[in-house]
Amino acid sequence: MRTTRTHVVLVLVAMLGGLLLGGSGLAGPAAAHEEREAGFPDGTGKRPSFLGLDNPRSRVVCRPDSRDRIARMPSGPLKRRNKALLRKCDFGSIQSAVNSITRPRTSVYVLPGKYTERRWARAKKSEYCANLRTESENPLPVSSYIGSLSSPDSGADETGPIALSYADQVRCPQNLNLIAILGDTTPHNKSMKCDGPLCGTQIVGTGRKRTDVVIDNKFSKLNAIRADRAGGVYFRNFTVQQAEFNALYVLETDGFVIDRVVARGNDEYGILVFAADHGLIQRVDTYWNGDSGIYPGSASDINGDNEEFEPTRYSIEIRRSKSHHNALGYSGTAGNSVWAHHNRFFKNATGIATDSLFPGHPGLPQDHARWNDNLIYSNNQNYYKRYVDTGVCAKPMEERGYMKGTVCPVIPTPVGTGVLIAGGNYNSTDNNHIFDNWRYGTMQFWVPAPLRDEYDPSKLYDTSNHNRAFQNSMGIRPDGSVAHNGLDHWWDDQGVGNCWEDNTSSREGGVPTTNFTVDPGPCADGGSQFVPGAPVKDAGFLSCSQYDRSDPTWRHPPECEWFESPEKPTDEQSDNPLGLAAPVGPSGPSAGVPGAAPALASALVGVGLMLVLGLGAVRRRSLTAVRG
């Protein structure tokens, strides 16, 4: 969710850096696209299985041209099955078919065609649903909103509140959603379990290709598809596009599968999963999204109390998928216990990112994700210069060309970065091919606890600990050819138990390039020791954090180099792409900073941390004022 975005991770470092170097702080933009406070499922659910194309408990949806589309299919069992399903078609709308379901584990077969759900997109709201801001019987207290720090423009006509209680979602499902699957029929009790006929619903496209069935929101609603407390839901074999917030949104759900889905051309997210467990995302293709293609945020924190590097189990698995041509391929605040493997994250601005920044998200600080056996490469797309600076993203949403490849980044992120860990713990980045990322192959830095409204002094340094990056191939393609990263590993020297070892590199002697000013040590010896984060390294993020694509002044903040395209690395080794990392050498972390000395740097860190504690409270008050 925008509220859970990784990339304003800069906000955190920016605050600290600005204080340390005398910066003026941040101007807090307006909040937008809030969501209700969410909780984790109880973990008793399970991953559902596909019920096939012959489930007797089914509904069939078709369009007027479905017959012609089926006629053009090549002969074979799939064509015969589609012709048989066509004879049973009783619905022209997916939502209408969902509304007719009376028993769990019902399949909704969607025949080839384009579905805009005009009936529901244009349906007149009831008196109650049209006046939720003042008339809601189940209002959502502003204090419980999961808020936002950015203020993208709104392409939808949102005259009412956009953070609704679950009870109001049930009563007004089309206020924000084109298609809504709401499984909890008892919204007024404390349970979030799926307990009604929509449990186990399967939405299945019956075409040969994922693009044979297209669900086109046309920016009519905030979300194209919402599955809320819908345990056992299964999505398969279709394309969903043109949502302002999420194309496919799964919330507070225990047990789900998203398989062979294309999510494209959305202002923010392709696939967003939040506060969910027992989930599988596989064989998806996400592109042209202004935030991330795949977002597993606040995944069930089943390892939150686990102080071992190995997780007890994972809550969400992502495999055999592609995420490309987005601002980020993958992101997630509190993306806990997520296992992403055998995927391709390429041609985004940043490939993978996770963070512990935003308050209100269950499961903070982030922990125990694993990214292994992925291809993470060529994440150098500069959509800031291509579309934000040129004014394309200032046009009305429907005129920006999202279905022609326009991407309007909602968030600031460092162009040219493969993997970004902003304040995560116990994460494993291993056995990946990370290459041709012109800024950094991997990047890791600390997130002070006050930035998530945690003021217990003992937790100040509770992020950026016990992460391991090992057995990765840096700057080398799978075929063995060279495609250098700008810098293989960037780290702010903060945190305990972090280690980087057994990684190979395209650079001289096969040794990865780093900006490390302290030796983290081997994993077997416990990794890094405690050292306060180097202000010289983090301070450069201040200007970037003020990015706001809807504000002409801050569309490209002055002196922000994150939105500059790094030059393609050459065989001449460089530890300092674009000058963004402090020069590393015998003089240590203060090198390149006139008049800076290690003692001064340490003093600044101490002063800065005290000020951050105060700024956290100011930030919380400013967000409350904006929402009010």
What would you call each of these model-derived segments?
Residues P29-S96, S100, K114-N131:
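Right-handed parallel beta-helix/beta-solenoid
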Residues E34-N55, E137, S144, S148-T159, ...:
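Acidic, glycine- and Ser/Thr-rich low-complexity intrinsically disordered tracts
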Residues G588-G606:
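Juxtamembrane/start-of-transmembrane alpha-helix segments at the extracytoplasmic/lumenal side
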Residues I162-L164, N177-G183, K190-G196, L222-R229, ...:
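Glycine-rich beta-solenoid repeat tracts in large extracellular/virion proteins
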Residues G608-G628:
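C-terminal membrane-anchoring or membrane-association module
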Residues R57-S58, L85-K88, E117-A123, C129-A243:
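Right-handed parallel beta-helix/beta-spiral solenoid domain characteristic of secreted/periplasmic
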Residues G200, K209, G231-Q242, D254-Y269, ...:
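Right-handed parallel beta-helix
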